[in-house]
Every structure is written in C-alpha cells, then in structure tokens.
Regions:
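Catalytic cores and adjacent flexible loops of soluble metabolic enzymes
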Residues: 1-207
Length: 207
C-alpha cells in the first residue's frame, strides 16, 4: 500500500483544501476497518472499496464499517466484465440495501467496448437507487477510455455521474483517462468551464 494509515495521508493534504474532496482506495482484505479513525474532516473524506467477485460480501461489511465511521464510501467491484447480468444485478441489490455514496463500473483490464459500458450502465440506471452516484473507472489498454467516457457523459441519467481521470492518463499498466483531454471535451460539448492551464502546469511541473 502507498499509505498505511490515515495519519500518513494527512501529512500530504494541503492545509487549505478548499472545496476538494480527498478520496483513497482500499483493496478489500488488505486493511482492517477497526484501524480506521473516526472521520474528523482533516484526512480523507471518501474511501473507495475495491474488491474481486469472491469478496463481495466481505466488501459490503467493510463498506458498512467505513460508513459507520462517518466517511463517504464507494462500492467498486473490479473487472466488471467478469460478471453476468444476474451477478451484477445482485451487486446492485446489495448496494441498494447498504446505500454507498457511489457504485462504480470498473474496466480493470481496459477491455470494455462501448457496448459493454452500455450494458452495465443500463443495468445500473434501471435498478440502482437514484440517490447513489454512478462512477466509471477505466484503463486504457485499447485506447478506449476517452471514447467510453464521452459516451457516458452524453447519456441522460438521474444519477450523479463520476468519471475518473488522471493527468496524462497516469495509472497502472496502460494508464487511465487523460484529465486534460476530457475536461476540454466537457468544455466544448457540455457547457463546462474547466480551466486547463493549471492542469497543464501540473504536467509540466511534476511529470
């Protein structure tokens, strides 16, 4: 793990975080929720629980414990393509019961085509409680992160939509969706008003 404790994360969070929500990921089975301090607003705000298919029940219990400590929690079943429709609906049913703040479509191997994204989004849109946000976490092995994100952003949905990205697509393996590309797309097509200059400066200064 990059950070073994909340205290280690607190040391790198700016004193003035403004309106930024700080999120971290936990791999189910790698961290004991009993070690997690009560949320106090000085560390991470959101915890994303990543898990494999065989860990679903364990992940639900971990999410419950995290919620009880006051954090926002996101349910992140890895390798979405490994689930049948019935299995994925089962996950959605679990989420509706314990009510995470978000439920993620995860393209762990970067192998999802648009039809795959559409399939999982359809299952979520028609079955997940509308108060639960929908997230999309992609990897760019087939260079489809950008087009898949465009597809999702164009859909009409009652859910809040979260699309993960990173500067220059930094991420494991083939990387993720490029923030600098996607915010420009949103500015041009969705009426967004993101400033790209700070993003490009971050790339120049840190990469």
């Amino acid at each position: 793990s990059q950070y073994s404790s909340v205290d280690a994360i607190k040391r790198i969070i700016p004193a003035d975080r403004k309106n930024t929500l700080i999120a971290v990921m936990i791999n189910c089975g790698d961290y004991d929720a009993e070690l997690l301090p009560q949320y106090d607003g000085t560390g991470p705000d959101c915890i994303r629980v990543c898990f494999h298919k065989a860990q679903a029940l364990q992940a639900v219990e971990l999410c419950r414990k995290i919620k009880e400590k006051g954090y926002k929690v996101y349910f992140q079943p890895m390798v979405a393509l490994s689930y049948s429709d019935a299995e994925y609906l089962g996950l959605i049913g679990m989420a509706n019961k314990f009510r995470p703040d978000g439920f993620y479509i995860v393209d762990s191997h970067g192998s999802m085509k648009q039809k795959d994204v559409a399939r999982f989004f359809y299952l979520i849109e028609n079955n997940l409680d509308k108060e639960i946000a929908v997230g999309f976490h992609s990897h760019n092995n087939l260079q489809l992160s950008y087009s898949n994100a465009q597809y999702l952003a164009a859909l009409h949905t009652e859910h809040n939509l979260i699309i993960d990205s990173s500067i220059m697509g930094m991420g494991r393996g083939a990387g993720n969706l490029n923030t600098e590309l996607f915010v420009e797309y949103l500015n041009e097509t969705a009426g967004a008003d993101y400033s790209t200059e700070p993003i490009l400066c971050s790339i120049d200064n840190t990469i």
